[in-house]
Amino acid sequence: MKDRYILAFETSCDETSVAVLKNDDELLSNVIASQIESHKRFGGVVPEVASRHHVEVITACIEEALAEAGITEEDVTAVAVTYGPGLVGALLVGLSAAKAFAWAHGLPLIPVNHMAGHLMAAQSVEPLEFPLLALLVSGGHTELVYVSEAGDYKIVGETRDDAVGEAYDKVGRVMGLTYPAGREIDELVHQGQDIYDFPRAMIKEDNLEFSFSGLKSAFINLHHNAEQKGESLSTEDLCASFQAAVMDILMAKTKKALEKYPVKTLVVAGGVAANKGLRERLAAEITDVKVIIPPLRLCGDNAGMIAYASVSEWNKENFAGWDLNAKPSLAFDTME
């Protein structure tokens, strides 16, 4: 049987990434060009800056991904691309490159939901058994997703306001930490103590919804009031207290979801899945189901995860036409 190679593109936010997946399960390359340094001084991603960076490096990323995989353009069997959710300008760069490559070589174009990519990155650890439940935690999303089979996703719970990663960045900015703040907060946690009583919104309510705006506001108010009084607060203790509240919320809702949906596997994915505190809590408290977390290199935005997610779409022959457009607000229930 002839080998099949998927060339995947991911440009939904501030990472330009191109990857090659061989025979559905062997990731040969996963090139990522990060823009973090360009956005640090703004304290967040500037859409126009992100789009321009994508344009500047996308061709080099394609060439590097093919070279690292040891294949040529003629060896590629299909092209996969993120078409949402994300920043519209950033998405369009990846879409344009992917469609141009597919059209030039007469290849099928596979549309992939960015969040499905995060979820299916777990396939790199071991073959997934369905049905399963997934906790997706990133800068833009906090969702509990029930997956009955590969490619069949149903959101059963989500945030009503801020995403968890967004909350990390906002409190990090208040403390003067560098963007993105998640990693630094996670490191400072282990040097501090949980001494500030921050709210755990909706933690006792009988639903699978999340809310982090109250926690964020309480944190900002505490910090602001201390500054007004000339008081000094321990950054380490603030981080420890904030993260303890976040983890209590995530764990409570995840446990409730596992009670409602009795599955054998829990996937935890997205940029925040790299958090040490979250991994420690999962290992200690979720012991009756298998917990699968992608390796650190596949937690952030990358094209490797898009390649993994595209396999089920290819098997269903869910190909896109040349009119495929960016859908910045794409949800699981509105996929192509």
From Swiss-Prot:
A biological process term (GO) from this entry: tRNA threonylcarbamoyladenosine modification
Coiled coil: none
Protein name stated in the entry: tRNA N6-adenosine threonylcarbamoyltransferase
GO cellular component: cytoplasm
Family the UniProt entry places it in: Belongs to the KAE1 / TsaD family.
Cofactor(s) the protein requires to work: Fe(2+)
Role of this protein: Required for the formation of a threonylcarbamoyl group on adenosine at position 37 (t(6)A37) in tRNAs that read codons beginning with adenine. Is involved in the transfer of the threonylcarbamoyl moiety of threonylcarbamoyl-AMP (TC-AMP) to the N6 group of A37, together with TsaE and TsaB. TsaD likely plays a direct catalytic role in this reaction.
Native organism taxonomy: Bacteria, Bacillati, Bacillota, Bacilli, Lactobacillales
